[in-house]
Amino acid sequence: MADIDQYCRVYDGFLSPSDCEEYIEKYEETLHVDNQKWKDLSVCIEKDGSKNPTCGGCNCDRLGPMEFERFNNLNQKLMKAWDGAVRKYIDDCQIVIPVQWPKEFGWEEFRIKRFKVNEEENHGLEDHVDVYSHAHAKRFLCLMVYLNDDFEDGETYFPIFESKVKPKQGRLFIFPPTWNYLHRGIPPRNPSGRGAKYFIMTHLNYIDLTNVNKGLDQTKRKAAAYDPNTKKMTKEQLSWPKS
């Protein structure tokens, strides 16, 4: 019988400490130097400044590093590393039957999230899955890299399996984002060197020929890039399901 370890994989040392630190430094620099551009391009913030309902109670300060030139070199290096990690994941999980894996697939744009320590409310999503609507059903794999570990707690927890993945700087965690992998982020706590937990992530998609999934450089973008599949959905349909 397969357990959580069959399709959930941890790869330590995936990103070097220096690359992790540089991502965090550039993230903070971007929020300071390009704060208005960050707000203008954010899918989490409405034009009136209110919270987008698709984010639920999340307060992750999400940032798209592909939209800012200072991340370009890091993103190219990360894309190459992620591509190799996916090939290793396929081998490690013994995915050998052709129908199990698409011949072509897309990568969602990278996103960095920051969760501040000791926030009991809005620290992140409670029990959830990353595929909860038709628009999200193109996702079939999640890749997440922990950029720091200088805090207590902050694990990724799977309640059904009663299993946790502990953040470790440079650690890559790969897992399916579907309904059967319910999970949540445990809030990070003090003592903490930076007062926050940072990670960078993406999803693999069944092929979707939209601009959202094309290329690493989105620095010329002038407005938030919403998934075309969501355009005809109401706010109620897009809202994060309440537990």
Per-region residue spans from a language model:
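Fe(II)/2-oxoglutarate oxygenase catalytic core
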Residues: 1-172, 180-243
